[in-house]
């Protein structure tokens, strides 16, 4: 029950029909803190075996009736990646990167959490060092790791190593998790049949509040699911393009010599997002029929790696690579560039070269 170990044990109790009471134990694990008292590094699939060993030992010390690690079901998981801007050669500060992220394509069904009280405005406002978006089934959280450590663990000896780190995190609650893995449970080494019920029957009972099918731990923590969760949710907000100043972004679009309607649509979105200081803000001003045109342009800009969010001129930075794509490219040492990707990269390089002349 020592939180400093990276594991907490919470007793749960709920009254159901006919005065029956269901009791259980909720275990909250911070993998890196559990393994090596590290509050910065993100856990990976290879850490699972060590986590299982420590959990089973701690559970056995508390009670022999506690389930083994593989017999438990996941209720929530927080896939994340740490991106060190300096290490990847990304030429902006963490504060600047968070500002760009806040201008991203925030879906209307996500609500931004207001975490700080502003004395001047006399109201709660969003944290300047993070973007915290939530729905009933998930949370997407982007934050500067160094600033967050200053709030939670200001005296942590390794805090300095997080000075240039941006963490991208997706917190998946039970319903989102089950929807992701319901058809691949059998791939788990822990999977067992659930009272003979078919998957679809279990899903219906879950929605009716009668049944919670087991979510195997190893399936969700596998790279297959982990990276799918991160890429799908993070790219939705960041988009897939690099950041440029408005003039350079416009020049890249024009360098393709698209038909006039397509080029006009893409540049129109670049200018609208720049003027509104964000994709979501620009989209909020549009009528329903205009949103269709706007979304089409977003996808077209993705294909040429131009982000709709542009770099403020006062920063004196011409190009900032896409955060998530740069991270995955660096991890894949044998990454093979497709002909189309090479074509897109050459367009960007040519325009930037002309800007330097």
Can you name each region flagged by the protein language model?
Residues 1-282, 303-357:
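Structured, helix-rich domain cores that form ligand/interaction pockets
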Residues 291-294:
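Helix-turn-helix DNA-binding segment
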Residues 297-300:
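Alpha-helical DNA-recognition elements
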């Amino acid at each position: 029950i020592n939180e400093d170990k990276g594991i907490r044990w919470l007793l749960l109790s709920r009254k159901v029909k006919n005065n029956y009471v269901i009791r259980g134990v909720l275990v909250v694990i911070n993998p890196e803190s559990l393994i090596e008292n590290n509050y910065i590094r993100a856990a990976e699939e290879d850490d699972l075996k060590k986590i299982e060993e420590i959990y089973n030992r701690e559970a056995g010390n508390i009670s022999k009736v506690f389930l083994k690690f593989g017999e438990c079901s996941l209720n929530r998981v927080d896939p994340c990646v740490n991106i060190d801007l300096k290490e990847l050669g990304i030429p902006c500060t963490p504060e600047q990167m968070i500002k760009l992220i806040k201008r991203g394509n925030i879906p209307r069904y996500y609500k931004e959490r207001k975490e700080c009280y502003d004395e001047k405005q006399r109201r709660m406002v969003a944290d300047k060092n993070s973007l915290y978006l939530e729905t009933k089934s998930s949370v997407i959280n982007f934050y500067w790791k160094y600033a967050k450590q200053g709030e939670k663990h200001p005296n942590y000896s390794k805090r300095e190593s997080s000075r240039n780190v941006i963490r991208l995190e997706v917190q998946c609650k039970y319903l989102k998790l089950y929807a992701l893995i319901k058809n691949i449970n059998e791939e788990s080494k822990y999977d067992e049949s659930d009272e003979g019920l078919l998957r679809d029957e279990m899903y219906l009972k879950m929605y009716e509040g009668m049944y919670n099918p087991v979510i195997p731990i190893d399936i969700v923590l596998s790279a297959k699911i982990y990276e799918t969760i991160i890429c799908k949710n993070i790219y939705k907000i960041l988009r897939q393009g690099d950041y440029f100043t408005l003039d350079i972004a416009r020049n890249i679009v024009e360098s393709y010599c698209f038909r006039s309607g397509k080029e006009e649509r893409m540049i129109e979105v670049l200018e609208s997002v720049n003027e509104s200081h964000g994709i979501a803000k620009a989209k909020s001003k549009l009528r329903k029929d205009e949103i269709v045109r706007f979304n089409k342009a977003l996808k077209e800009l993705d294909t040429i790696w131009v982000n709709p969010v542009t770099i403020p001129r006062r920063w004196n930075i011409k190009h900032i690579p896409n955060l998530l794509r740069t991270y995955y490219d660096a991890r894949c040492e044998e990454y093979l560039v497709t002909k189309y990707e090479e074509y897109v990269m050459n367009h960007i390089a040519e325009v930037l070269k002309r800007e330097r002349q």
